[in-house]
C-alpha cells in the first residue's frame, strides 16, 4: 500500500501545466514510456478522491492475474529476472547486463514474455549461458523456487521457454488452418484442442436464449483425467489470492461511493468476484451501464476477449477515471443524436436498430491503468460487450482524453509528418485539426460504432470466431469514418470546418496502407485485430476506388506516399464497406468475414514494409508507447484522519514495476 503523508504543502497541488510537464520517461527496444497528467484531480471532493484512491488500490492488485493469463510461466520468469536485477553483485555495466535489463523492461511492457501488440515472443539479446551464471549467483531464497525445486531445476525449466524460438512462439495465434488453441501460448486453456473447446461451449449455448451469459468468460478450461473442467476465476477458485485482495479494496471503496447506484455497482462486482457466477456478472454490467450520474467511474474485471483466439475468455483489466465535464459536452451531442446516426447509416434496414437505447458517452480522465490496460492502454472504451445487454440496456462509451493528450504532446516536432505526409496541405490540416478529429473519431467509434446495428434473431454472437474482433473493430471504425465526413458534423458544432474531416481520412488511410507497418516484424503477417482492421479498410477502399483514382500510392524521390484525390468518393466507399461488414456481423457470415480479413487485412507488402521500417529508423521513433501511473498517497491530519489524497508524477518506469512486484504480488508463482 502506498504510504501516508501528514498534511502539508503537497496536498491540493494544481495539476502541472502541459508546457511544464515531462511526458517522456524511458525508451528501449521499440517502446517509448510516457507519463500522463491527471487534470482537475485537485478539484474533486475529498470523498471522491478517497473513492479514486481505494479503486486504484483494487486495480493494482490484479496485475499478476494478467501475467498468468498470458502464459503459465510468466510469473516465474518475471520474478527470476527481478531477483537477478535487484540482487546481482557482478558487473552491472556490461552490454550483457544492459540486454538483460532491456529484456526485463520488455517483459513488464508485455505483461509477460510476448510482445503486447505483435504477440511474438521476445528473444533475449544475452545468452542462455550468461543467464544461467547470473541466476546461480543469486541466493536461492530470493528466487521463485517451487517446493522441492533446486536452482538448476528452475534454470532448466525456464531457459527453453525464454530462449528457444520454437517454444511458445506466439501468445495469441490467429493464423488460418491451424489449431488456434494448441498453437497459442496463453494460459486460458491447457491440454485441450480447438474442436474440443468449440464443442464444450457449443453444448452450453441455447440458440433460443435471448439473454445468454458470456460462456467461458472467467475461467480456464483444462482436461483432467480425460474430462474437460472449467477452473473459475473467483474467491476460493483460480487466482483467489489476488481476487480476494481486489475485493478487500472494493469493500473499502463502497463506503465512499457517490450515490446508491454506484454502491450497487461495486457490491454487485464483489458478488461476482465471490461467486464467479456469470449471471451476477451480467447484473453488475447492467448496473454499471445504467450508472450515468457518478463522476468517478471504473472498470475492474475480466473484460476484453482479444487475448483468446476464439474470443471467449477475458483478460483482467482495470481503469479508474473521472468525467472531464467540459470535454464531455462533445460526446453528449453525439449521444443525443444517436438515433439520427443509426437511421441515416448506409447499412441495410434489417440490420439497423429500430430504437437506439441508452447510448451514453463521456470524455474521461484516467487516474490509474492496470492489467490489460497497462503499460499499453486504449484511448477509448465501449462496454459492456454482451450483445443483449447493449441492445436492452445500452452501452457506455468513453474517450480517454488525458491519454490522447500525452500521445499528442510527446509527438510534437518528431519529424513524422514531414517524412510521411504527401504535401504541406496534409501537414497543415494535421496541425490544425488532427488532435480534434482523432478524438472525434474515437468518440464516434466507441459511442456510435460499437453501439450500432443488431444481430438477426438466432445468430450466435461468436459466429465469426477468430475473425470476430477484426470485423467488430472495422465496423466501429467505418461507422466513425463515414460520419466524420458528413455535413452533420459541422451542423452540430463537432467540427469547426467542412474540410477538417480530411485530416482524419488522410491519417487513417496513410496508417492503414503504410505507416502502421512499422509495428510488424520483418517477414511477418499482421496478427493484431486493430491493425488487421485498419489495413482491411484501407486496402479495400484503395482497390475499389482504383478506377477513379480515389487514392493513389505514388513514389517521389524513391519514397512512397499516399495521395487522396477524392475525399467525397472515399466517404462513399467507406459507406459501402460498412454496409457489407454490418451484413457479415448481423448474419454471422463466417466465410464472408474470413474472406475480407484474409484477402485485405493479413498479408504485408514486403518491399513497402522494408522501406517504412528504414524511414522510421532514421527518425528514431518508437512505434509503440506505454505509460507509468501517477502515485497516489493518503494525506492524514494531526488526528490521524484522511484530509486529502496527493498525486505525484515522479516515479520512473523501473521503480514503478519493482514497487508493484513488491507491494501487489499476491499470486503464487504456479497457479
Locate predicted features.
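Long, well-structured alpha-helical subdomains associated
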Residues: 481-584
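An active-site-proximal "capping" alpha-helix that borders the catalytic cofactor pocket
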Residues: 45, 259, 469-486
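Contiguous, non-catalytic segments that form substrate-binding/exosite surfaces or channel walls
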Residues: 105, 109-223, 228-427, 434
Amino acid at each position: 500500500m502506498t504510504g501516508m503523508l501528514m498534511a502539508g504543502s503537497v496536498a491540493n497541488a494544481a495539476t502541472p501545466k502541459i508546457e511544464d510537464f515531462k511526458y517522456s520517461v524511458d525508451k528501449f527496444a521499440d517502446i517509448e514510456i510516457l507519463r500522463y497528467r491527471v487534470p482537475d484531480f485537485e478539484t474533486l471532493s475529498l470523498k471522491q478522491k478517497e473513492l479514486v484512491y481505494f479503486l486504484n488500490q483494487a486495480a493494482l492488485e490484479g496485475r499478476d492475474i494478467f501475467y498468468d493469463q498470458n502464459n503459465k510461466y510468466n510469473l516465474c520468469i518475471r520474478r527470476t529476472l527481478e531477483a537477478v536485477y535487484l540482487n546481482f553483485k557482478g558487473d552491472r555495466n556490461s552490454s550483457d547486463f544492459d540486454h538483460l535489463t532491456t529484456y526485463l523492461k520488455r517483459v513488464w511492457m508485455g505483461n509477460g514474455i510476448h510482445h503486447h501488440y505483435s504477440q511474438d515472443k521476445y528473444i533475449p539479446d544475452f545468452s542462455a549461458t550468461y543467464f544461467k551464471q547470473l541466476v546461480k549467483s543469486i541466493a536461492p531464497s530470493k528466487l521463485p523456487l517451487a517446493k522441492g525445486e533446486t536452482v538448476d531445476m528452475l534454470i532448466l525449466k525456464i531457459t527453453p521457454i525464454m530462449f528457444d524460438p520454437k517454444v511458445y512462439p506466439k501468445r495469441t495465434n490467429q493464423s488460418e488452418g491451424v489449431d488456434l488453441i494448441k498453437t497459442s501460448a496463453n494460459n486460458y486453456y491447457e491440454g485441450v484442442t480447438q474442436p474440443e473447446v468449440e464443442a464444450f461451449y457449443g453444448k452450453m449455448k441455447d440458440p433460443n436464449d435471448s439473454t445468454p451469459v458470456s460462456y467461458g468468460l472467467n475461467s480456464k478450461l483444462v482436461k483432467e483425467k480425460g474430462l474437460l473442467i472449467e477452473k473459475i476465476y473467483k474467491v476460493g477458485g483460480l487466482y483467489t489470492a489476488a481476487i480476494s485482495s481486489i475485493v478487500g479494496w472494493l469493500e473499502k471503496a463502497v463506503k465512499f461511493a457517490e450515490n446508491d447506484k454506484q454502491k450497487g455497482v461495486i457490491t454487485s462486482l464483489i458478488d461476482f468476484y465471490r461467486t464467479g457466477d456469470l449471471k451476477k456478472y451480467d447484473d453488475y454490467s447492467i448496473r454499471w451501464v445504467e450508472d450515468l450520474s457518478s463522476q468517478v467511474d471504473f472498470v475492474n474485471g475480466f473484460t476484453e476477449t482479444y487475448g483468446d483466439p476464439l474470443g471467449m475468455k477475458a483478460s483482467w483489466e482495470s481503469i479508474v477515471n473521472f468525467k472531464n465535464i467540459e470535454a464531455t459536452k462533445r460526446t453528449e451531442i453525439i449521444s443525443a443524436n444517436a438515433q439520427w446516426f443509426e437511421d441515416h447509416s448506409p447499412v441495410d434496414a434489417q440490420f439497423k436498430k429500430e430504437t437506439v437505447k441508452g447510448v451514453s458517452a463521456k470524455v474521461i480522465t484516467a487516474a490509474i491503468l492496470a492489467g490489460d490496460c497497462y503499460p499499453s492502454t486504449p484511448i477509448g472504451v465501449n462496454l459492456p460487450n454482451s450483445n443483449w445487454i447493449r441492445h436492452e440496456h445500452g452501452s457506455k462509451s468513453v474517450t480517454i482524453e488525458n491519454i490522447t493528450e500525452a500521445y499528442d504532446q510527446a509527438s510534437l516536432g518528431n519529424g513524422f509528418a514531414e517524412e510521411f505526409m504527401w504535401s504541406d496541405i496534409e501537414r497543415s490540416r494535421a496541425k490544425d485539426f488532427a488532435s480534434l478529429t482523432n478524438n472525434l473519431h474515437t468518440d464516434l467509434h466507441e459511442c456510435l460504432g460499437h453501439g450500432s446495428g443488431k444481430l438477426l434473431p438466432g445468430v450466435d454472437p461468436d459466429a465469426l470466431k477468430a475473425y470476430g474482433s477484426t470485423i467488430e473493430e472495422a465496423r466501429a471504425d467505418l461507422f466513425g469514418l463515414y460520419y466524420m465526413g458528413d455535413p452533420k458534423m459541422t451542423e452540430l458544432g463537432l467540427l469547426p470546418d467542412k474540410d477538417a474531416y480530411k485530416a482524419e481520412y488522410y491519417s487513417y488511410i496513410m496508417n492503414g496502407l503504410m505507416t502502421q507497418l512499422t509495428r510488424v516484424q520483418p517477414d511477418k503477417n499482421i496478427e493484431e485485430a486493430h491493425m488487421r482492421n485498419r489495413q482491411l479498410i484501407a486496402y479495400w477502399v484503395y482497390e475499389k476506388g482504383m478506377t477513379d483514382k480515389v487514392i493513389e500510392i505514388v513514389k517521389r524521390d524513391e519514397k512512397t506516399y499516399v495521395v487522396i484525390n477524392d475525399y467525397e468518393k472515399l466517404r462513399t466507399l467507406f459507406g459501402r464497406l460498412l454496409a457489407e461488414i454490418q451484413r457479415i456481423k448481423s448474419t454471422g457470415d463466417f466465410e464472408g468475414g474470413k474472406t475480407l480479413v484474409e484477402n485485405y487485412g493479413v498479408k504485408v507488402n514486403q518491399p513497402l514494409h522494408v522501406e517504412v521500417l528504414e524511414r522510421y529508423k532514421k527518425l528514431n521513433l518508437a512505434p509503440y508507447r506505454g505509460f507509468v501511473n501517477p502515485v497516489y498517497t493518503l494525506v492524514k491530519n494531526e488526528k490521524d484522519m484522511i484530509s486529502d489524497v496527493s498525486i505525484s508524477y515522479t516515479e520512473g518506469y523501473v521503480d514503478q514495476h519493482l514497487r508493484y512486484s513488491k507491494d501487489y504480488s499476491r499470486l503464487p508463482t504456479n497457479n
